[in-house]
């Protein structure tokens, strides 16, 4: 029966499930704990949790400084409002993300609460398979907690506002207070360390190799994300040991446009299924032409023609400046090339194999190990056939270079949004085609932390709203 798990899970992920609200009892038969009676049904339930995981990298990238609008951006009314940081759009986003993450956590909990009694009925081989599943579930839960913390709590260094997010271990609805940021971080670390240990000892998953599922390397990379969020540089260096190949080659680089189609495991440590509508905001669905793309890249992120990433990361276009002048224009190409060719991607990358390189390089530089940091990042740039960071760049300039290269690599994948917040950097947005600065969001703006949504404010134990946001979010 186990040989049927892989195709079944892929089918379930492709179909997608309608996630329930935090306030609605579990009705999905796949996540009903009483329906989990075997390894196979446990994996079916876990697939529902994977599907519930929010897919908002594009909208978070709009809130960062990854994109600049084109003159067609206004044809999609919600994206320009989000790009302009309107309170209404931020409230809508907070509601979507809060419910999406906690639906995923609820689905994970439905699996975890059933495992102890199920384990006693299984053979030794099935127990190892169940152990692997448990590690996946804990990793997914930790990822949700980390992203909730980054979105709904002030920066980790802000000791004046210690409130984090709600930690939930039960399936049933319950009113709980927000734990502190430190308590949440400790829980995330515990979940990931337990998962990493189990991944190491339990062998391979029962369903074989599937790109939409988590494993040991993904768990370690998420742990590195947690530690860089906390400013634990030595911890980042420690956990990224073994995640980076001794020889960094072009094999890490999605060079072909088709490499963005289905979460290729050569590049993905974790990829998430997406609905076909996911990409509709970045282009105008009715035309499927380059001219219909709503957002372009800022010029500082342009890739050189000889860079191996150019072919798949970039859509080349031309901007008419005036009657006699044009200039090259680079539009985001990840996934978009496929859409322009009328081919819809089925998964998006959430954790990529290249990410530990940039996490480790930053951590090394911050510990004064600048030569090691520069050598590491330049090895990746060399594989990309991109210009290296100069030996003369040290100190703050070296850190700026590393973060700049990280943004060029992961543009549109939401990582920049989290980096700008933890680094305390302002967000600068532009009018179409970078003609002028349209908006600057300083590091201390209340808009940098999403509000606890209205749906959760009925929780009598939730405590104060996030700084700067009205307690009644219906206010204009």
Where are these regions (language model features)?
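Short, surface-exposed recognition loops and adjoining beta-strand edges that mediate ligand/DNA contacts
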Residues: 33, 60-74, 154-163, 201-283, ...
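Membrane-proximal, proline-rich intrinsically disordered regions
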Residues: 20-64, 240, 303, 388-389, ...
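Conserved, well-structured interaction surfaces
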Residues: 79-152, 179, 197-200, 344-348, ...
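Extended ligand-binding clefts on enzyme/binding-domain cores
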Residues: 213, 230-353, 398-432, 449
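Inward-facing hydrophobic residues that define packing positions of alpha-helical scaffold repeats
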Residues: 105-108, 185, 192, 240-241, ...
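Short coil/linker segments at helix-helix boundaries
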Residues: 121, 125-130, 151-187
């Amino acid at each position: 029966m186990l040989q049927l798990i892989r195709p079944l899970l892929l089918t379930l992920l492709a179909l997608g499930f309608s996630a329930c609200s935090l306030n609605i009892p579990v009705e999905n038969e796949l996540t009903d704990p009483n329906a989990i009676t075997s390894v196979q049904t446990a994996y079916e339930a876990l697939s529902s949790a994977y599907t519930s995981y929010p897919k908002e990298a594009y909208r978070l990238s709009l809130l960062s400084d990854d994109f600049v609008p084109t003159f067609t951006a206004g044809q999609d009314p919600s994206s320009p409002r989000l790009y302009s940081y309107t309170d209404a759009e931020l409230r809508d986003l907070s509601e979507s993300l809060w419910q999406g993450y906690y639906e995923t956590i609820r689905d994970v909990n439905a699996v975890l609460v059933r495992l102890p009694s199920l384990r006693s009925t299984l053979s030794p081989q099935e127990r190892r398979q169940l152990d692997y599943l448990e590690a996946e579930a804990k990793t997914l839960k930790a990822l949700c907690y980390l992203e909730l913390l980054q979105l709904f709590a002030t920066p980790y260094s802000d000791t004046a506002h210690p409130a984090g997010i709600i930690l939930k271990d039960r399936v049933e609805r319950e009113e709980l207070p927000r734990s502190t940021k430190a308590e949440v971080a400790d829980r995330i670390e515990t979940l990931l360390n337990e998962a990493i240990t189990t991944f190491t000892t339990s062998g391979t998953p029962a369903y074989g190799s599937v790109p939409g599922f988590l494993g040991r390397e993904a768990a370690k990379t998420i742990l590195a994300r947690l530690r860089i969020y906390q400013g634990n540089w030595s911890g980042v260096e420690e956990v990224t040991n073994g995640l980076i190949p001794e020889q960094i080659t072009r094999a890490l680089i999605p060079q072909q446009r088709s490499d963005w189609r289905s979460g290729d495991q050569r590049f993905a440590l974790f990829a998430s299924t997406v609905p076909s509508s996911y990409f509709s905001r970045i282009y105008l669905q009715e035309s499927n032409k380059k001219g219909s793309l709503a957002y372009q890249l800022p010029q500082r992120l342009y890739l050189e023609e000889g860079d191996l990433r150019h072919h798949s990361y970039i859509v080349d276009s031309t901007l008419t400046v005036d009657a006699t002048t044009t200039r090259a224009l680079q539009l985001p190409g990840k996934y978009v090339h496929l859409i322009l060719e009328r081919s819809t991607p089925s998964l998006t990358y959430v954790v990529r194999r290249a990410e530990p390189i940039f996490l480790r390089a930053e951590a090394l530089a911050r510990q004064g190990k600048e030569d090691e940091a520069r050598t590491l990042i330049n090895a990746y740039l060399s594989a990309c056939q991109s210009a290296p960071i100069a030996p003369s760049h040290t100190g703050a300039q070296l850190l700026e270079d590393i973060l700049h290269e990280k943004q060029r690599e992961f543009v549109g994948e939401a990582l920049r949004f989290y980096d700008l917040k933890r680094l305390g950097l302002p967000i600068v947005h532009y009018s179409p085609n970078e003609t002028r600065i349209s908006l600057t969001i300083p590091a201390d703006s209340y808009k940098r932390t999403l509000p606890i949504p209205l749906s959760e404010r009925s929780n009598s134990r939730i405590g104060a709203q996030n700084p700067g946001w009205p307690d009644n979010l219906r206010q204009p």
